[in-house]
Amino acid sequence: MAFLRSFLGAKQIIRRESSSTPRGFMAVYVGENDQKKKRYVVPVSYLNQPLFQQLLSKSEEEFGYDHPMGGLTIPCHESLFFTVTSQIQ
């Protein structure tokens, strides 16, 4: 069951190299410390989810409102990001 939830959650997260972001989605950069950040596109509805808001709080603690990537940067390991986003459904 967890695999199915993870698979369905992965359909909502889009890894995009291009700078375009579809309507109703937002770009976030995910990665820890000096590791290269990867860009993902997630639904804006995630902003209302308590689990995602915990990631945003971690981002605010580390960066304040000045994000070095120019977009929203979430300072966590990719596996944690996928775990959190797979639980939002």
UniProtKB/Swiss-Prot annotation:
Function per UniProt: Functions as a positive effector of cell expansion through modulation of auxin transport.
Disulfide bond positions: none
Instruction: Look up and give the organism this protein is from.
Output: Arabidopsis thaliana (Mouse-ear cress)
What GO cellular component term, any one, is given?
plasma membrane
Gene for this protein?
A: SAUR15
- Write the protein's name: Auxin-responsive protein SAUR15
Expression induction per the record is: By auxin. Induced by epi-brassinolide (epi-BL). Induced by cycloheximide.
- Highest taxon of source: Eukaryota
The record ties this protein, via PANTHER family, to: SAUR-LIKE AUXIN-RESPONSIVE PROTEIN FAMILY-RELATED
The record gives the membrane topology as:
Peripheral membrane protein
Q: Which UniProt keywords apply?
A: Auxin signaling pathway, Cell membrane, Developmental protein, Growth regulation, Membrane
Please give the family membership noted in the entry: Belongs to the ARG7 family.
Cell compartments where the protein resides:
Cell membrane
